[in-house]
A protein has these predicted regions:
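Short, hydrophobic/amphipathic alpha-helical patches that form generic packing surfaces
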Residues: 115-118, 220-226
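Short basic/aromatic active-site micro-motif
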Residues: 111, 216-221
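Signature for HUH/AEP ssDNA processing cores
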Residues: 1-73, 77-101, 114, 120, ...
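Non-membrane alpha-helical secondary structure
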Residues: 142-149, 193-200, 218
Length: 226
């Protein structure tokens, strides 16, 4: 299957990580250690920023088999609800200002989409599969924690809001602005010649590899960047 989950500007959402690590730097064991390290960092700063304590079994880890050029994983953190993707992006930005989240893709915090559990990228056979990881003396959430595999799948969607999230404090844009002065995204200086803007854009698009035109996620990211 080749399914993706998407969201709108004001969709309530859970925090997640998208990790892609090059095979030349990692083996399976090192990649699992990277996953654990990044999970612990998110747990640490959720407590520091929002006074929320993620439990290890609030965390769902999805991982592909080793690919020719990389290891990939999606991590979903259940239990704390964010007002929208912009608030998630702010959480990520504030974390990385204090501590590195190695090999994590920040582009997922836009108005974009995320590949679902059991799905692969089109034309490839590396689906994201649930894995159970031991962190300290506890294990991350797994299929066996739910009555059915469908129940588990629904919980892997970051737009699924259940009773636990509704009971907890939602992290809103208003709260973030009141607590912290959120900096704007850095703008790269460009040539101010408006007459050349259309030409420059055509030049950029003409030099894109073909795969960027054939894969929705990559094309979507190009659009957001431009």
């Amino acid at each position: 299957s080749y399914y993706y989950e998407s969201w709108l500007e004001n969709t309530n959402i859970l925090f997640s990580l998208d990790i892609d690590a090059p095979v030349q730097n990692f083996d399976s064991l090192k990649f699992e250690k990277l996953i654990i390290q990044n999970i612990n960092i998110v747990i640490k700063f959720a407590k520091e920023f929002y006074n929320h304590e993620y439990k290890i079994n609030d965390v769902i880890v999805l991982k592909t088999e080793k690919q020719p050029n990389k290891f990939s994983s999606h991590i979903i953190f259940r239990g704390l609800l964010f007002e929208n993707h912009k608030v998630c992006r702010n959480f990520f930005t504030r974390i990385v200002k204090k501590e590195k989240l190695n090999y994590c893709d920040s582009s997922i915090y836009g108005k974009t989409c995320l590949r679902t559990c059991y799905s692969s990228k089109k034309g490839k056979e590396y689906p994201l599969l649930p894995v159970k990881i031991k962190i300290g003396n506890e294990f991350t959430c797994s299929v066996s924690d739910y009555q059915t595999e469908l129940d588990f799948f629904v919980q892997t969607l970051i737009t699924t809001v259940d009773e636990d999230e509704l009971k907890s404090k939602m992290v809103t844009e208003k709260m973030i602005v009141q607590e912290y002065d959120v900096p704007s995204l850095e703008v790269v200086p460009t040539n101010n010649n408006d007459n050349n803007s259309e030409y420059d854009l055509s030049e950029i698009l003409s030099k894109l590899p073909e795969e960027y035109c054939n894969e929705y996620v990559k094309w979507n990211r190009v659009g957001m960047a431009l």
